[in-house]
Swiss-Prot record:
Associates with the EF-Tu.GDP complex and induces the exchange of GDP to GTP. It remains bound to the aminoacyl-tRNA.EF-Tu.GTP complex up to the GTP hydrolysis stage on the ribosome. Residues 80-83 are annotated as: Involved in Mg(2+) ion dislocation from EF-Tu. Keywords: Cytoplasm, Elongation factor, Protein biosynthesis. Gene3D superfamilies: 1.10.286.20, DNA helicase RuvA subunit, C-terminal domain, Elongation factor Ts, dimerisation domain. It comes from Acidovorax sp. (strain JS42). GO terms for molecular function: translation elongation factor activity. This is Elongation factor Ts.
């Protein structure tokens, strides 16, 4: 059996960024063969990734990349907010956004097969993801992305949890302000005419319920419903919203854009974890389960 030295462990860690104890175990199993130990670690880290794959990822980051008229927005998820602040995780997200912009992958699976090496976990982005799962011990996933091309682009990231890309013609400063506005006010459409019919139907149903409870005559109730729907449309359409930086507190986004001779052709808003049902842990139940498992294994 070959002697496993501290320098060998350090060398393997430098190549794989795996935990020190995992490196020592791999070297011991490989009888000091560095190449074999490195391969053993890759397999082991991949196994850890498989075990973590079923765990919910509702935290994470939104990353963007823009180069001229080509850009991308991507959401990358983790299990905890702690991991979303990890430098390697953030680097992976930024790299993924760049790969989307440069290669236009068809879907998440195709994105994962693109070449990219980070922390010695390459050669593909999927290898990097699995390597980080093995290193950190948390599941992580590429949730969604969008690629943009052919238009002027402005991006805004609020921290790392909210990301916006605006497609526009005109003034770049005005477009950047709109991106910031979208992050703050979260409109669902450019104009009231673009608001999805299902959202309008839901709002109308709520308004009708309130009108029915009011006991007002039918004609007045109908006006109440229509008024509520119109108010909702103004609140959720970008053009009709009051611009967040309006000096008078009244100027709408549409008015601001007209003054800046700028047209917004579209926008995309990503909010980390939006629509993902988070797992709520019952700590007492978890402890009880662990105690029961320990007793059964004794």
């Amino acid at each position: 059996m070959a002697a496993i030295t501290a320098s060998m462990v350090a060398e393997l860690r430098g190549k794989t960024d795996a935990p020190m104890m995992e490196c020592k175990k791999a070297l011991t199993e490989a009888d000091g063969d560095m190449a074999k130990a490195e391969e053993l670690l890759r397999v082991k880290l991949g196994t850890k990734a498989g075990k973590a794959a079923s765990r919910v990822t509702a935290e994470g980051v939104v990353a963007s990349f823009i180069n001229g008229n080509v850009g991308a927005l991507i959401e990358v998820n983790s299990e905890t907010d702690f991991v979303s602040k990890n430098d390697s995780f953030i680097a992976m997200a930024n790299a993924a956004a760049k790969l989307v912009a440069e290669h236009n992958p068809a879907d998440i699976e195709a994105l994962g097969q693109l070449a990219y090496e980070q922390d010695g976990f390459g050669p593909t982005l999927e290898d990097v993801r699995k390597g980080l799962i093995g290193k950190i011990g948390e599941n992580m996933s590429f949730r969604r992305f969008k690629r943009f091309s052919g238009s002027n682009l402005a991006a805004y990231l609020h921290g790392s949890r909210i990301g916006v890309v605006v497609e526009f013609d005109g003034d770049a400063v005005a477009a950047k302000d709109v991106a910031m506005h979208v992050a703050a006010m979260k409109p669902v459409a450019l104009t009231s005419a673009d608001v999805p019919a299902d959202l309008i139907a839901k709002e109308r149903a709520v308004a009708e319920g309130k009108a029915a409870e009011s006991g007002k005559p039918a004609d007045i109730a109908a006006k109440m419903v229509e008024g509520s729907v119109q108010k909702y449309l103004k609140e959720v359409s970008l053009a009709d919203q009051v611009f967040v930086k309006a000096a008078d507190g009244k100027q709408t986004v549409a008015q601001m854009l007209k003054a800046a001779n700028t047209t917004v052709k579209g926008f995309t808003l990503y909010v980390v974890g939006e629509g993902i049902e988070k797992k709520v842990d019952d700590f007492a139940a978890e402890v009880a389960a662990q105690v029961a498992a320990a007793k059964s294994g004794a």
